[in-house]
């Protein structure tokens, strides 16, 4: 395997307008490269030349246009050319109206800035390795959710097969949520233990029926939350048809993972008595006016128990 590219956010990102114009010039060069490759292909295959419309389907600019247009809902790249006065025009529309390059937002510019270097080194060779650091930088959270599939599509051929392996390092919950929902992606958490970095795989599927931001924050960033706690509690109820909190409390209490000296915490509501730390915290969250409090350690302990039950 060949390392195709090691790409850090320090390489191309703190850009001024002049720097962005240089990226646009490189985009123009990619179109010129496509034209040269088309001519060269037909010289080599003069017995069976391709029409431009056929060759364009596997060109770099077609790859750029398809990925860019799929990423932005209200924006489109439609080509480049020259005006009657020989002024270079890069074709972008937003909400159906043509705009100039300077009207692009910082996030829109960044997508172009990140894409151009990748297209420059893209070849027909397969099974390369691509490294991208912080692909979500400067992007709106909605775009952070989409950037994972954007880079995958960039290296997917016309038959829908991804041709290169991509490694992306991210601290974005929105990005990681999409990655964890993709069965073809492997999410690995890096943990620093006294100066030694260890890798921990985040398994598919997770504990919930659908990946949530609260679960991403816990599994990847080790952030405990009341939201994730009660999502796990509801998951146990739904999985085992336990509509009443008391029924769920009894189920947890009699589960083989329940350890009395760790997980028992008696509480009550009216005549109903609950015996588990999970129900105690669940009720403290849902009925915050009941005066019940809990520590972060108790919250973590309860989450870990419910994960074991759902494993």
Segments (PLM) and residue ranges:
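Switch/communication elements of ASCE P-loop NTPase nucleotide-binding domains
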Residues: 1, 86-211
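Generic structural signal for hydrophobic residues
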Residues: 64-68, 147, 212
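RecA-like P-loop NTPase motor core
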Residues: 153-161, 174-311
